[in-house]
Amino acid sequence: MSFVVIIPARYASTRLPGKPLVDINGKPMIVHVLERARESGAERIIVATDHEDVARAVEAAGGEVCMTRADHQSGTERLAEVVEKCAFSDDTVIVNVQGDEPMIPATIIRQVADNLAQRQVGMATLAVPIHNAEEAFNPNAVKVVLDAEGYALYFSRATIPWDRDRFAKGLETVGDNFLRHLGIYGYRAGFIRRYVTWQPSPLEHIEMLEQLRVLWYGEKIHVAVAHEVPGTGVDTPEDLERVRAEMR
């Protein structure tokens, strides 16, 4: 099954300026992500960036670059620009791999592509079980609840589902009903084209989660439990030091 990986790599970052180019053990972070994507068996890998320095680093590593505008409001909008520039057919399977995930396992890149290809749905993603209270109550860990067929009912920064009886006794432990969403998505190119025609939803603005736009407009997102748990992503200088140590 063929699929394309697109890696959005926006240069500007409030907490970590020039994030795609930060050095991790002798290589720019974006090159580590590119290498993980190559291991997935993708037919084509494209780094979508708004900065010439990022483009040069990717091309020096033998990667393909698509220059995009700097004013996109979301990663999906950046994907849509690449879809149009590359003239992908509507049924092309595209996996969006975040440019700040240098430890992402290649197996889950392939997994999300396979899951999408096996279903008549426009979008698929992954999640992992939550086993500790700290993560369950952390608003930076996005939770997802599913229906009986594995489709998302809702994504939230809140603790969902709320375990009424357990939490009435205390908030120290959690059961087996919590899933943390992973920021990796598979789409069909035609779905991306439709997504960017929709107005942002109120829920999307409240939670600051762009995938809620899909549910708002009545579309389905399939969610599978990831075969592997990805390593730390890089959002802050502290994350960067942790990743450097783990990848040493």
From Swiss-Prot:
Instruction: Tell me which UniProt keywords the record has, alphabetically.
Output: Cytoplasm, Lipopolysaccharide biosynthesis, Magnesium, Nucleotidyltransferase, Transferase
- Name the Pfam families on file: CTP_transf_3 (PF02348)
**A GO BP entry:** CMP-keto-3-deoxy-D-manno-octulosonic acid biosynthetic process
Pathway per its UniProt entry is: Nucleotide-sugar biosynthesis; CMP-3-deoxy-D-manno-octulosonate biosynthesis; CMP-3-deoxy-D-manno-octulosonate from 3-deoxy-D-manno-octulosonate and CTP: step 1/1; Bacterial outer membrane biogenesis; lipopolysaccharide biosynthesis
Instruction: Name the Enzyme Commission number(s) assigned to this protein.
Output: 2.7.7.38
Where is this protein chiefly located?
Answer: cytoplasm
Coiled-coil positions are none
Reaction(s) catalysed (UniProt annotation): 3-deoxy-alpha-D-manno-oct-2-ulosonate + CTP = CMP-3-deoxy-beta-D-manno-octulosonate + diphosphate
A molecular function (GO) held by this record is: 3-deoxy-manno-octulosonate cytidylyltransferase activity
Q: List cofactor names only.
A: Mg(2+)
A single GO CC term for this protein reads: cytosol
From the Swiss-Prot or TrEMBL record, state where the protein is found: Cytoplasm
Q: Which family does it belong to?
A: Belongs to the KdsB family.
User: What does this protein do, in the record's words?
Assistant: Activates KDO (a required 8-carbon sugar) for incorporation into bacterial lipopolysaccharide in Gram-negative bacteria.
What's the protein called, per UniProt? 3-deoxy-manno-octulosonate cytidylyltransferase
Give the originating organism.
Escherichia coli O157:H7
